[in-house]
Swiss-Prot record:
Job of this protein: Methionine-sulfoxide reductase that specifically reduces methionine (R)-sulfoxide back to methionine. While in many cases, methionine oxidation is the result of random oxidation following oxidative stress, methionine oxidation is also a post-translational modification that takes place on specific residue. Upon oxidative stress, may play a role in the preservation of mitochondrial integrity by decreasing the intracellular reactive oxygen species build-up through its scavenging role, hence contributing to cell survival and protein maintenance.
Catalyses which reaction(s): L-methionyl-[protein] + [thioredoxin]-disulfide + H2O = L-methionyl-(R)-S-oxide-[protein] + [thioredoxin]-dithiol; [thioredoxin]-disulfide + L-methionine + H2O = L-methionine (R)-S-oxide + [thioredoxin]-dithiol
Pfam families: SelR
Species of the source: Homo sapiens (Human)
Tissue-specific expression: Ubiquitous. Detected in retina, ocular ciliary body, skeletal muscle, heart, colon, bone marrow, cerebellum, small intestine, fetal brain, fetal liver, kidney, spinal cord, lung, placenta and prostate.
Cofactor note (record): Binds 1 zinc ion per subunit.
Subunit structure as annotated in this protein's UniProt entry: Interacts with DAOA; the interaction is direct.
One GO cellular component, as annotated: cytoplasm
Gene that this sequence comes from: MSRB2
Transit peptide region: 1-20
Residues given in the record as Zn(2+) binding sites: 90, 93, 146, 149
Protein name: Methionine-R-sulfoxide reductase B2, mitochondrial
Amino acid sequence: MARLLWLLRGLTLGTAPRRAVRGQAGGGGPGTGPGLGEAGSLATCELPLAKSEWQKKLTPEQFYVTREKGTEPPFSGIYLNNKEAGMYHCVCCDSPLFSSEKKYCSGTGWPSFSEAHGTSGSDESHTGILRRLDTSLGSARTEVVCKQCEAHLGHVFPDGPGPNGQRFCINSVALKFKPRKH
């Protein structure tokens, strides 16, 4: 209760409340601590956007994929053949999701990664992603969403390269690439 009061004390009348999130885009990322970024500062994010606000912020294709759980056509994504070193962020909230070091060519038509950024062994608690059961096509698959804004990113399959055997099949349109600074 004390923490909630501390969070609310800076609000003035007419100010929309902000909610604490774990990590911050470009910092330690989601999962770095209980509402704290790397430097220990409280990271905040606006309340979840309404559908109309997402439609204003995103292109129609980005909205369809990230907010309506769509899929871009295979072999059409801008990042499919990207070989530049850097980080792939969520197009909706800028949370770091996947490193180019874990990207590989799976031949499936979508950018593929062997693990999410921040994975330690099989521990994904410090990554920017969440896994969810998806039964939308009549069979069970594992959906991958952004931990910070719940954007649909793609799916993960158990047919990837070793040692963990995972293939994160991610829509390019759900990503924003930031090249590594030299």
